[in-house]
Amino acid sequence: MSFLGMGRPQPTSEQKIAAVESEMRMMADTYNRLQQSCQKKCVPNDYREGELNKGESVCLDRCTAKFLDTSMKVSEIMQQQGQALGGQQGGGGMF
C-alpha cells in the first residue's frame, strides 16, 4: 500500500497478464533469432549426418554464448538509457 496515496497504482490482473504475454513474445523472438542466426552460421544446408559433428556443435555453443551475451549487454544499455531519459524528464522511466 502506498504512503498517503502517493505511490504508483498496482497493476491489474489484465495488465499483469499482458506484461507476461509481452515478455513471452520477446523471449520467443530472441530464441527464434538465435536459432536462425546460429544455424545459418554453423550448420550447412546439406545435412551429411543425422547428428551434429564436433565442429558444428562447438560452433553452435560459441554462437549461442555470444548471441546471449550480446543480447544481455544491449538490454543493459537500453535500460541505462531509459533510466537516464526518465531522470531527465523528471519522472519514472519505462524501464
UniProtKB/Swiss-Prot annotation:
Leader sequence residues: none
Membrane topology category: Peripheral membrane protein
One BP annotation, GO: protein insertion into mitochondrial inner membrane
Cysteines joined through disulfide linkages: C38-C63, C42-C59
Keyword terms of this UniProt record: Chaperone, Disulfide bond, Membrane, Metal-binding, Mitochondrion, Mitochondrion inner membrane, Protein transport, Translocation, Transport, Zinc
Domain of life assignment: Eukaryota
Location, primary (coarse class): mitochondrion
Compartments where located: Mitochondrion inner membrane
Motif window: Twin CX3C motif: 38-63
One GO cellular component, as annotated: mitochondrial inner membrane
Keyword Transport attached: yes
Gene3D superfamilies listed in its UniProt record: Mitochondrial import inner membrane translocase subunit tim13 like domains (1.10.287.810)
GO MF: metal ion binding
InterPro entries: Tim10-like (IPR004217), Tim10-like_dom_sf (IPR035427)
Self-association and partners: Heterohexamer; composed of 3 copies of TIM9 and 3 copies of TIM10, named soluble 70 kDa complex. Associates directly with the TIM22 complex, whose core is composed of TIM22 and TIM54. Interacts with the transmembrane regions of multi-pass transmembrane proteins in transit.
Entry text on domains: The twin CX3C motif contains 4 conserved Cys residues that form 2 disulfide bonds in the mitochondrial intermembrane space. However, during the transit of TIM10 from cytoplasm into mitochondrion, the Cys residues probably coordinate zinc, thereby preventing folding and allowing its transfer across mitochondrial outer membrane.
Biological function: Mitochondrial intermembrane chaperone that participates in the import and insertion of multi-pass transmembrane proteins into the mitochondrial inner membrane. Also required for the transfer of beta-barrel precursors from the TOM complex to the sorting and assembly machinery (SAM complex) of the outer membrane. Acts as a chaperone-like protein that protects the hydrophobic precursors from aggregation and guide them through the mitochondrial intermembrane space.
Family affiliation: Belongs to the small Tim family.
Protein name: Mitochondrial import inner membrane translocase subunit TIM10
Upper classification of the organism: Eukaryota, Fungi, Dikarya, Ascomycota, Pezizomycotina
Gene: TIM10
